[in-house]
Amino acid sequence: MYSMNRVLIKIWGLLCVLLMANDASAQRVMPVIKIYGDFFDEYTEGKIIVCDPDSLYPDTFNMLAKYRGGTSKNYEKKNYAVKLVDEFGLKLSASILGMRDDNSWILDAMAVDKARMRNRVAFDIWNAMDVKPYYYEREPKVRTGISGKFVELYLNDDYNGIYCLNEKLDRKQLKLKKIKDDVVRGVLYKGFDWNGTCFGDEPEPYSNDSSVYQGFETVYPDVKDNGKTEWEPLIEKEDFVVNSSEDVYAAEYAEHFDVPMLMYLHILINTIGAIDNRGKNQFFYIYDITENKKMSFAPWDMDSSFGRDWRSWVYEDSYDKLWFENHIITQINDVDSTFLNNVANLYFKLRKTLLANDSIKSRFDEYFKLFEETGAAKREYARWNGTDDIELNFEEEKEFIHQFIDIRMAFLDGYYGDYSGVRNIPSEISDGIVYDIFGRRVYNPQPGQIYIMNGRCVYFRK
């Protein structure tokens, strides 16, 4: 394994303390992680050292690590997939920074996110919803979201910026049944592309020897670990959505899909304006296909949200469009007029608490405050501002996100209000006149601001 002198490790433990306190203006400290090795698209050996401000000594592990992601690999600031191993290269599990005991971790660079926190905040909201899948009574410890902690990362002694150390969403987190006596029970799929993942395409020939199918990848059973997987449960759902008559769909959709989970996801994805999560960047799973083939869902990779897309650009349609309208949902709407009424009632219940504007804003504000008070914001700016044509300004981005939340929630109040009877925003403003987000007429729109014109949100470019 990747070797490192024990004396150097002890020295690094002392340096951790210095690194976390080296900014005289810092009021707080963030955990520091240092990784050693040469990393590529495939796993290579390395070392990871974790310095927790609440611990006296650092934790040191052998690891295998590689670049993680699809398009994110094109950016200079890389994501890393990390697997902890022992001195013999065998799987090793450990709890890091108070999170779950596991061997597989993600170091999320958040390179396209000008706030460096969108995905984390989205998961914080989802976790606060505390949504339970249909098999919760059998698995009370099931979790459909992940925990994550912000850290400052050093790559081979060079500062590499703010990262979020995340858990993985996997069979273990979702408490799916393991293979037993060579019989597949729990299954877990992930949407990585738009091809097929919105359940609008006819089923195609498939092979259980392949890890991919129509934009899905199998997470469990994993072909690499088990030699095969099981695609049939997913194909059955695809066939049901595409080929069922309206009468059959109306009578049976609740047997096929976890409807309460769909309701919460409808609200989450629309609240954050996640433009890349209707099928892609979503998990699909069944607890035990030998007993019940009902499918449930969970979100993933929600960085294209809160007003920006996967390139970090302002995405105007994210302000006043719906973003969770895959074919499962649209066909439920077609055959069951009560579905959106129930979603709307749930939405307005959540609006009183964790989806109140100030509640959502405060989640961002706490992380922005953490970055500022630890000095991490300054270091991130110095290291990465302008790289890959992405300009950083945390104060401006905070205001941008606040503005998005006000506009987006006003739009959703109107949309869901049509189904619940709740009306607490004015009717559409039109006639080509420009208004600010508070409905006041604007005679001199300023570049870089968002306004309302003809009932739509418009971003005036610089």
Which residues does each PLM region occupy?
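Bacterial N-terminal signal peptides that target proteins for export
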Residues: 2-12
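Bacterial N-terminal signal peptides
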Residues: 10-20
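Residue-level detector of functionally pivotal "anchor" positions at catalytic/ligand-binding pockets or at interdomain
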Residues: 417-438
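Middle-to-C-terminal accessory/interaction subdomains
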Residues: 60-61, 71, 75-76, 219-279, ...
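Conserved NTP-binding catalytic cores of kinases and kinase-like/nucleotidyltransferase enzymes
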Residues: 27-121
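C-terminal tail/sorting-segment detector
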Residues: 450-462
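Boundary at the C-terminal end of the N-terminal hydrophobic targeting segment
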Residues: 21-26
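Internal "kinase-insert"/substrate-recognition segments embedded within catalytic cores
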Residues: 88-89, 95, 100-112, 116, ...
